[in-house]
Amino acid sequence: MRLSIALTGIVSIGLATTVLADYKAGLAAYQKGDFKTAVAQVRPSAEQGNPSSQFGMGLMYRNGQGVPLNYQEAFNWFRLSADQGNAAAQYNLGAMYNNGQGVPKNLAEAVKWYRKSAEQGNFRAQFNLGSMYQLGQGVPQDYKEAARLFRLAAEQKMSVALFAMGGLYFKGHGVPQDYNEAHKWYRQAA
């Protein structure tokens, strides 16, 4: 019995090492612009459930890199990765729902996935979710929540979020109107 458990553990470690090696080889090929090789290296580990590889497959299908452009296939790969907690995949699902790429446009789903990603610190998701609160798209308009989210993204030096914070202070939306504070945020964005 112990031998069986030990062998299972060794096989699992071996498979995990292979999956990681495939992912790293695929990532290196992707960074060199060799997308066909990237797909060939990443797909096996994606099919074995590696969330980073699943995200990579989604990215390549979304951009038509090494595979034909296919938003539905990109969505499917992003969903597999997002369900395992990958913040970048969650952000991409939010964007696909927000733009109606690969799925019907659904602002409530966009908000859901942006929020999951934003809670993990993804500044793009924080900004996009903040924009949805600012405009009242998929959520009730809430300038204070928009300011909170923009600030989180701005703290990560996202220039458009810095600019958005300037706009909120200039207009007094969700924060006290303060032209000096607006100027400070605008200068940081420049």
What are these regions (language model features)?
Residues L15-A21:
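Sec/Tat signal peptide C-region and signal peptidase I cleavage site
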Residues M1-L7:
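Bacterial N-terminal signal peptides that target proteins for export
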Residues T8-G9, V19:
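Cleavable N-terminal signal peptides
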Residues D22-A29, Q41-S45, G56-N63, N92-N99, ...:
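Hydrophobic face of amphipathic alpha-helices that form TPR/SEL1-like repeat modules
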